[in-house]
Amino acid sequence: MNGGPSGFHNAPVTKAFVITSALFTVFFGIQGRSSKLGLSYQDIFEKFRIWKLIMSTFAFSSTPELMFGLYLLYYFRVFERQIGSNKYSVFILFSGTVSLLLEVILLSLLKDTTANLLTSGPYGLIFASFIPFYLDIPVSTRFRVFGVNFSDKSFIYLAGVQLLLSSWKRSIFPGICGIIAGSLYRLNILGIRKAKFPEFVASFFSRLSFPSFGNSPPPAPSRNIVGTISPNTGRRAERSQPAPLPSSVEPSEEAITTLVSMGFDRNAARQALVHARNDVNAATNILLEAQSH
């Protein structure tokens, strides 16, 4: 199992978020303030340090947490490629906001004024992403080590457990809040899974994501990461599209590779791209609709 093409190709929102998180963590780390970014009852309800709500969403409190956190954020870029940057932006906002709200409610219930009860970092987004990871990403390889069964997904779970236990209860609580937020998104509360930002908002992240870094197109097709799509799915996608016009532009190998890396049949991906005039997002929607029939 892998996360598709290497780098942040077709994942500009993830790229912007990872860079922002790294910069904030390094900035506060240099100042020696990273360990003070965690949320506490005193900060929020007595001193009204509302700015900590925002900073705690991006900056990790230690180097080990930063390493495991960025690794997981980087891997979960696969979901942006699956649903598109616009909907993934909604997922980030929803999971982060709901998780943060749950953390504030937790602080108000515990009323512990002695220390920072909750560690900082994008725990909401990371652990919300484990919901689609568990439900949508199939196991492609299984193996045994000293009689214990493992799969290719085990490494992601182990990284998540390490991050969850990195600060004991200070990190466990934010992780649980993230899992709850991801579950609510999965349940499509208030139709959130259909929500989209205006296009200019989604494209804003693309302009922030420093195109010169990590956006090179993949040189060759990648392995299927979301399960093998049956040939029937490919044929359904082909039948669902009218014959392309003679003047249609031949799909680029880069676009075909991107769709194949998302788990679609190569022939179906090519037909969808022809119909969508080489628009990867539109082709993805066509293929998803074909699968639902």
UniProtKB/Swiss-Prot annotation:
UniProtKB keywords: Membrane, Transmembrane, Transmembrane helix
Record-linked Pfam families: Rhomboid (PF01694), UBA (PF00627)
Recorded GO MF terms: serine-type endopeptidase activity
Transmembrane segments: 10-30, 53-73, 90-110, 117-137, 145-165, 172-192
Protein name: Rhomboid-like protein 20
Main subcellular localisation: membrane
InterPro entries per record: Peptidase_S54_rhomboid_dom (IPR022764), Rhomboid-like_sf (IPR035952), UBA (IPR015940), UBA-like_sf (IPR009060)
Compartment(s) of residence: Membrane
Recorded family membership: Belongs to the peptidase S54 family.
Source species taxonomy: Eukaryota, Viridiplantae, Streptophyta, Embryophyta, Tracheophyta
Gene Ontology biological process: defense response to fungus; heat acclimation
This protein's GO CC annotations: autophagosome; endoplasmic reticulum; membrane; phagophore
Membrane topology: Multi-pass membrane protein
PROSITE patterns (UniProt xref): UBA
Function recorded in the entry: Probable rhomboid-type serine protease that catalyzes intramembrane proteolysis.
Domain of life, per lineage: Eukaryota
Region annotation Disordered: where it falls in the sequence: 214-251
Organism: Arabidopsis thaliana
Ranges of residues in domain UBA: 250-290
